UniProtKB/Swiss-Prot annotation:
This is NADP-dependent alkenal double bond reductase P2. One of its GO terms (biological process) is response to oxidative stress. Keywords: NADP, Oxidoreductase. Its EC number is 1.3.1.74. GO terms for cellular component: plasma membrane; plastid. NADP(+) binds at residues 164-167, 190, 206, 230, 252-258, 282-284, 332. The keyword Oxidoreductase applies. The gene is P2.
Length: 343
């Protein structure tokens, strides 16, 4: 038996989440799994803060095809990196590392499931990368860019929220394909990162642009072939005016809308017809069968320094609520990670 610190979800949220929507508590856990079960006891090392988690904070919505609401009074959960302490599962043994869905706590008891938990085979890269670059956000970038957008060399690519966990990798994939890529972000520091660290051809601070369509026209005088959508709202409206005929839009997220009581409408949808634009929403879970192919692409390039990644690290489980809430105010620079234990 040992103590187990946890981040508890207090109650369903409307509007922007606050740190006060969570409790920090300490309970106890037995360091063993029930005899005969296929459960695995893990020690959580790193936690991932992701925008999709906001969709789980509202009241349960029977009409939702995806998000299952967090239960008040229970630990919230998300992607993390963990070490196996004890296992009743045939595929995992003590000492194994994995990434996947775990509770926001020091120790979790999980039942590993395909496409929800992945054994870590490559440990010659930072383990924290499996919360981002080599985990769900990395696979999201890969699926949206290669599988949904079907890119071609020489095409033009626009990425919103481009300095985040997904966007920074989409931009690098685009450059690897020989595309012209522009990103937007919400601060000078982030814009500079896009151009100096991630190799974007151009970037702009959307907060300093009074006319988003004009900003896109400036960056894409010949139009946009592919848009990796992370924002929604006014940005999507402006993009539709600047898309080329037969352009493709991969809809990954709409972070500008998640905390609004009434979501903003999009007014330029007729462009989809006249320009024959293909818009496709996607969920990364539909593409996890391609994870080995994804690793074959990115692992060598990480080791060769051809792919780089920026993390914003919060130390300690007690910092997790602040880190998660900050995500929705643009406070993170790069992938937001919470370190529980460094091993």
């Amino acid at each position: 038996m040992t103590t187990n610190k946890q981040v508890i979800f207090k109650d369903h949220v409307s509007g922007f989440p606050k740190e006060s929507d969570f409790n920090f508590t300490t309970t106890t856990v037995e360091l063993r799994v029930p005899e005969g079960s296929k459960s695995v006891l893990v020690k959580n090392l790193y936690l991932s803060c992701d925008p999709y988690m906001r969709s789980r904070m509202g009241k349960p919505d029977p009409s939702s095809a995806l998000a299952q609401a967090y239960a008040p009074g229970k630990p919230i959960y998300g992607y993390g990196v963990s070490r196996v302490i004890e296992s009743g599962h045939p595929d995992y043994k003590k000492g194994d590392l994995l990434w996947g869905i775990v509770g926001w706590e020091e120790y979790s008891v999980i039942t590993p499931m395909a496409h929800m938990h992945f054994k870590i085979q490559h440990t010659d890269v930072p383990l924290s990368y499996y919360t981002g670059l080599l985990g769900m956000p990395g696979m999201t970038a890969y699926a949206g860019f290669y599988e949904v957008c079907s890119p071609k060399k020489g095409e033009t690519v626009y990425v919103s929220a481009a300095s985040g966990a997904v966007g920074q990798l989409v931009g690098q994939f685009a450059k690897m394909m020989g595309c012209y890529v522009v990103g937007s972000a919400g601060s000078k520091e982030k814009v500079d990162l896009l151009k100096t660290k991630f190799g974007f051809d151009d970037a702009f601070n959307y907060k300093e642009e009074s006319d988003l369509s004009a900003a896109l026209k400036r960056c894409f005088p010949k139009g946009i072939d592919m848009y990796f959508e992370n924002v929604g709202g006014k940005m999507l409206d402006a993009v539709l005016l600047n898309m080329n005929p037969h352009g493709r839009i991969a809809v990954c997220g709409m972070i500008s809308q998640y905390n609004l009581e009434n979501q903003e409408g999009v007014h330029n949808l007729s462009n989809i017809i006249y320009k024959r634009i293909r818009i496709q929403g996607f969920v990364v879970a539909d593409f996890y069968d391609k994870y080995p192919k994804f690793l074959e692409l990115v692992l060598p390039r990480i080791k060769e320094g051809k792919i780089t990644y920026v993390e914003d690290v919060a130390d300690g489980l007690e910092k997790a609520p602040e880190a998660l809430v900050g995500l929705f105010h643009g406070k993170n620079v790069g992938k937001q990670v919470v370190v529980i234990a460094r091993e």
